[in-house]
């Protein structure tokens, strides 16, 4: 027999064996496809999905960590503080001491401490009860912070191209707080209130920054506490299967009941960038919060978008807080809450990563959502929203009526010009039901808890907000080059003729002198002029 024929038969036998093995593998994969698919989906999606078996389960939460992300990371490190028994005793003693000092005026105490007068327990030892539910949500398949933030960076550099990027979306059942349960809503509001409570300056802060202090020996860098930063209080249930992030809201001297601390100036700056039409350019009397104003009712849109994502702005800070929490709890369901500015940031953060978020008395954040180019699934139905805005009709900040030169917000230096919310709104009509008057004092978190949430027998019904459009009278341009309006040929000719006759008849008119105001009193009247 020829050698070539032996080789051919040997290869044929080997090929037949390989084909047999492949067919066997394909058969095994086919009969076990459901098991393989389940394991694959479990590895690529966070373990916050739940079915009917987990519905209406009640959890008890306590505060576990405090995160503080500074705005200037060159002089301060991002740190976290573990809430240990030693810290609780120290914080509890300080809070009780403040209560004793202010025992003659409890209302003033709670204005400063931002803790409900109806809750007798200490904010550092209180146990929060939340009932979970299962909701249908449409969100991105890949919600890893690295992937999401890289997409956002690309969207800000190339917004037109980013709209053409095909993102993978998934419909799934997600664990979420049951906002139809009264005790759950009150507990979330108390968590938001807890984020305002002043911290003792002492504590064993842990460095979460990515840089090594040994490489920067000339920098006097502290960890955890600074005058400029964002604070997030982290709550966990017994088995850490559910984590709640409560973001601190606005502290301001001009907003009663919002507390006063070191973050006041930056809180106002971020409020004015997030919730104004253009850098808080309310009138010529105002100093703008950024340099995007072009001329009357004209604003540089690209400049505004870049302002929102600066590293020293609050949105970037809460992205870092979320990243740290998810890294520490990769298999936990993450819920987010907050009051006022903290509520708006909670909504933006929940929208970014597809996490359930409950906001209390937040200003309208739909405009900021669009400017940040947050991922929005096409044709998202209202029932698949995971963002809830809880508020009442006597709060002008939540209702979007705290604007205008004579408003309380404007007098305090806040340009709250937005009124449109994303997600769903749950509104208590206290003006009709209780006869309340619209007043900025009603924006206080403990007023909401004590006067509304605990007083009503049922929670407000959540619904999709009506169609809304903020800043409709503003013109937004891409870049500083504003297109000039072209005049007709007849008007141009008449203008040229007028200029020629002016130059040939008699002496030229005297030059006009312009004056500018270089000093104003506290109500805006000019008291000193300069040439």
Swiss-Prot record:
Q: Where is this region: Disordered?
A: 482-513
Gene Ontology process terms (BP): multivesicular body membrane disassembly; neutral lipid catabolic process; phosphatidylserine catabolic process; piecemeal microautophagy of the nucleus
Q: Where are the transmembrane segments?
A: 12-31
Q: What is its main location?
A: membrane
Residue ranges annotated as coiled coil are none
> Which residues are reported to be glycosylated?
178, 207
Question: One Pfam family, short name please?
Answer: Lipase_3
GO CC annotations on file: multivesicular body membrane; vacuolar lumen
**Which keywords, in A-to-Z order, does the entry hold?**
Autophagy, Endosome, Glycoprotein, Hydrolase, Lipid degradation, Lipid metabolism, Membrane, Signal-anchor, Transmembrane, Transmembrane helix
Q: Which residues lie on this side of the membrane: Lumenal?
A: 32-531
Q: What is this protein called?
A: Putative lipase ATG15
- The scientific name of the source species is Kluyveromyces lactis (strain ATCC 8585 / CBS 2359 / DSM 70799 / NBRC 1267 / NRRL Y-1140 / WM37) (Yeast)
Which gene carries the instructions for this protein? Answer: ATG15
